[in-house]
Swiss-Prot record:
Signal peptide: none annotated. It is found in: Plastid, Chloroplast. InterPro entries: RuBisCO_ssu, RuBisCO_ssu_dom, RuBisCO_ssu_sf. It comes from the Eukaryota. RuBisCO catalyzes two reactions: the carboxylation of D-ribulose 1,5-bisphosphate, the primary event in carbon dioxide fixation, as well as the oxidative fragmentation of the pentose substrate in the photorespiration process. Both reactions occur simultaneously and in competition at the same active site. Although the small subunit is not catalytic it is essential for maximal activity. Heterohexadecamer of 8 large and 8 small subunits. The keyword Isomerase does not apply. The keyword Metal-binding does not apply. This is Ribulose bisphosphate carboxylase small subunit. CDD domains: RuBisCO_small (cd03527).
Length: 139
């Protein structure tokens, strides 16, 4: 099951040249760019591991591409995304985020139903990858 989070998630994976163009666009807007990775892509897991520090004053997309390449070396089967942060007054938020790498095999999620007080049903989404292996050894 293909994880769909962020911009471009329903499109085919971006090439490195397309990623570089998107990073260049973010930098042309004055946005700070960062690289993050995880092995738990649960939809509510919004806090991925930050790779290095955000690249605040970097003006060349090649620097981001270098950091992305280093992150890919260390996390060859993890999820990696690029974020762009707009620090301008009134926004101060992540304005663009997209996955740039994913594992070859994405096992997907399962729905767990639990009956609670008053015959109410609670639903939980869990990842098959998280269920099968500990953190750091999932892909």
């Amino acid at each position: 099951m293909r994880v769909t989070q962020g911009c471009f998630s329903f499109l085919p994976d971006l090439s490195d040249e397309q990623i570089k163009l998107q990073v260049g666009y973010a930098m042309s807007k004055g946005w700070a760019v960062s690289v993050e990775w995880t092995d738990d892509p649960h939809p509510r897991n919004s806090y991925w591991e930050l790779w290095g520090l955000p690249l605040f004053d970097v003006k060349d997309p090649a620097a981001v591409m270098y950091e992305l390449a280093e992150c890919r070396k260390v996390n060859p089967e993890g999820y990696i995304k690029i974020n762009a942060f707009d620090a301008s007054i009134g926004t101060e938020s992540c304005v663009m985020s997209f996955i740039v790498q994913r594992p070859i095999n994405e096992p997907g999620f399962y729905l767990e139903r639990n009956e609670v007080q008053g015959r109410n049903i609670q639903y939980t989404i869990s990842s098959y990858a998280v269920q099968a292996r500990p953190s750091g050894d999932r892909y």
